């Protein structure tokens, strides 16, 4: 009976079934043929790069039958698709790409269940693309932001609605089905300066924004939107670069008709003591009950979305986060947390055991930034790095091969981590009763 209750609690808190994949994670290997030099250089790029452009974003497809397809987005505005089941016959080559923007692409996200994706770029636009085995075709371009678009994400299981966030501090919601004059899409709604204080300079109110501009109150500045994730169809969670606040928004409201500062329905304020309280990315567990927030203070905080408790439920540490390019994600079952790091490694934690990581992926030589986990099947991980290479990590053989010293270019190494002083105050595994007293972000 106790085991049944434990399993029900794990399901409720987003940890899925009690399958132990630690052995598979321990055997993750990057082979020589799984090391790639990013995406080929844009021949028409206006950027004067003295090195290969970095990969800024990578995501595995969620479309049935295409789960092994990895989308890559580069610093000079190109996107590429990689079949990760195919190992390169000539390693360390660049992937052939398509020019999507003439500026950096900061984020890329797949349309749920489709071979279509959106790209968020430094040229202030979001673009929707149709992908097949032969070509990448532009469907539409979405313009309304004033600054670099940092992130864009679809609503869960919705192929028509997505949101975007930018350095202008604004969040826009777009419906790709909407018809617009001259085929110039406008957002359905918006949250202006979502992580700062603003005043509206126009008296024109409308439920559908017209990309009107708002100015900041003296002494304030727009805080860049760095992460967006939907909890459900009507609830959006956002984080910013400098205000130290996670905000939960009711997207059924029309925030654009209000002249005052937009008010979220819940907020989670930074509880640490560091001056580096900007957030770099958000991840949500499969049951959408636990939020993981990567912070510049070198801690990933988890928060309870069923109670919206103000305090962190748990903390995961041991990596270094010294830039807004360091991202994190979860394994498909929510049992593992993966993050890039400034110290040349990617780190893996067991979500049911907060504290230090259990493994680190060794092989890169600079800051590891974007990371991705294949959505189905045996663990396959992608990591991008400022050393100019991206790597594919697979479950290797249990025993070392004869040519491992040549063929293996990276391994998962176990980590023995001492408990953080604060960790004794945190529950190692969330429980029903724990939700009432545990610290949540």
Describe each PLM feature range.
Residues 15-42, 67-96, 132:
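Beta-propeller domains
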Residues 65-71, 114-118, 139-140, 158-163, ...:
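Structural hallmark of WD40 beta-propellers
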Residues 36-42, 81-95, 102, 114, ...:
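Per-blade loop-tip surfaces of WD-repeat and WD-like beta-propellers in eukaryotic adaptors/scaffolds
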Residues 47-77:
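Beta-strand-rich domains and repeat architectures in extracellular enzymes and scaffolds
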Residues 59-67, 108-114, 153-159, 222, ...:
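Loop/turn segments within WD40 beta-propeller blades
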Residues 1-34, 38, 184, 188-215, ...:
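Terminal intrinsically disordered, low-complexity extensions flanking WD-repeat/beta-propeller proteins
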Residues 73-76, 120-123, 165-168, 176, ...:
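Conserved strand-to-loop turn within each blade of WD40 beta-propeller repeats
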